[in-house]
Amino acid sequence: MSLVESPPWQALKSKYQELSSLHMRDFFAQDKKRGTRLSLEAAGLYFDYSKNRVDEKTIDLLCESANACNLPLRIEQLFSGKLTNESGEMVGFHTALRQVNNFSFKTNNNAIQEIHASWEKIKKLSIRIREGDYKGFTNKSITDIVNIGIGGSSLGPQMAYNALKPYVKAPLRCHFISNLDDTDFYETVRTLNPETTLFIITSKTFTTKETLENARRATEWLMQAAKKENLIQTHFMAVTAAPEKAHEFGIQKDNIFMLWPWVGGRFSVWSAAGLSLAIAIGWEEFFEFLRGAHAMDTHFRQAEFNKNMPILLALLSIWYINFFHAKTQAIIPYSQRLVYLPDYLTQLHMESLGKSVQLDGSAVHWQTGAVVWGDLGTNSQHSFHQLFLQGTMVIPVDFIAVLKNSRESHWQLPLIANCLGQSQTLMEGYDKEGVMRDLINQGIEHEKAEKLATYRLIRGNNPSNTIILEELNPYSLGSLLALYEHKVYVQSVIWNINPFNQWGVERGKHLAKDILQALQAETDQSSFDSSTERLINYVLKIKGNRP
């Protein structure tokens, strides 16, 4: 039986018909304790989902749908290393990277032992650099770490580093290079000293075009200063699942850190792919980062579905995507330190859930995934919240608020007020009675107020979740990221798709090689469609190779 034919799914269709014409204002008016009932705390996070177009029966039916998809079994497979891809290879075992309590996994002991060894290696390097004992080619201590990678090899470490900057030990600084455009590289290193700069090359296969090209640029940049190749070897580390290729590139074997094939790039920040972060904040704080994620792992495995934060977050997304036909979801963090979180979550969601084939190879017959995007509040209030408030689409929003940036900082009350004000407005709207009352109180005549009111109405009934971190620290950040990882995994289980591959992106890379040959050597263009052929000819014309 397919997902859409299951009894809970059919019941959800009827529930949608019942609720689609109701307004959330009425839910709150009828239930004064709704905000209390539809909220929970876990792993250092507070989650309010009361401003959603659901009642308790909806939640029950969504949970039944999850059970019908064997979610309990699939959760245990995630934590036991029993998930495999279409080739039978283990995937999705990133949860092992943050198993910090007695290492109690029942299977894959070899993997756990390798993880422990990796931890020790990361810890030792972090201590050496932070204490100034790791030297460059002129015997100066390292001050700048440059992470070269792309996708998950860059987005995760950069996001986490920026979020945890108060924990970075001066004078250490981290920088991140990902783009094939050489501007990214040269603008990053422009103010750096080659004598005190360490490059970390992160690539699972060590064949990624963008990463290797930037690694080559790094080699040339260092050689201009050091003059001799043997002198720059201490300035390179590699994180990869292909150590032999990293060694062929010129990385010393002792400077190569393991990244296992069963860890996807977008789930790799917990591994040595987070080496730059571990160096910057120190091993103890990095371990707190892992502990926070593990706390959310434990909650995810143990809590009942209707009290389970990742599962509820996923089921609500399913509700809006598959029944309200929402095409997009927004993530709005109210903390400057979380500026890169929307980009990170965009990749996590869209690369994992952008699939149209089920696990058995058959076509999907229901919507999967959505466009996930966002920006910082309050900046976003002055750019695109207008679409949320007075547009015509259903756009679920996740608001993420931080009460205090650190133990020493002040409460972020103005930010919190804006965050809560946005969520309340999205829910209740601004009806004509309220608009007229406010306009008349401003001294505007009734007739003019009537005309103005039409343009100021806000229908409301737009869903949102609010997630609150008491403090933004390594533990709470780890918990927050694991929350969204598990949310995405639950969605993939219900849609019966594989969240651990991304074959779609490979085709464009392959075609880029052919097009580059045409641009460089004027090879036969008959294999290209007429549009691509015309674009190639235009580039060649401007370049001066064609009349």
Curated annotation (Swiss-Prot):
Keywords assigned: Cytoplasm, Gluconeogenesis, Glycolysis, Isomerase
Catalytic activity reported: alpha-D-glucose 6-phosphate = beta-D-fructose 6-phosphate
Active site: 351, 382, 509
BP terms from Gene Ontology: gluconeogenesis; glucose 6-phosphate metabolic process; glycolytic process
Any Pfam family the entry gives: PGI
Pathway: Carbohydrate biosynthesis; gluconeogenesis; Carbohydrate degradation; glycolysis; D-glyceraldehyde 3-phosphate and glycerone phosphate from D-glucose: step 2/4
Signal peptide: none
Presence of the UniProt keyword RNA-binding in the record: no
Keyword set includes Isomerase: yes
Subcellular location: Cytoplasm
Gene Ontology, cellular component aspect: cytosol
Gene Ontology MF annotations: carbohydrate derivative binding; glucose-6-phosphate isomerase activity; monosaccharide binding
EC number: 5.3.1.9
EC main group: isomerase
InterPro entries on file: G6P_Isomerase, G6P_Isomerase_C, Phosphoglucose_isomerase_CS, SIS_dom_sf, SIS_PGI_1, SIS_PGI_2
Role played: Catalyzes the reversible isomerization of glucose-6-phosphate to fructose-6-phosphate.
Family the entry assigns: Belongs to the GPI family.
UniProt name for this protein: Glucose-6-phosphate isomerase
Gene: pgi
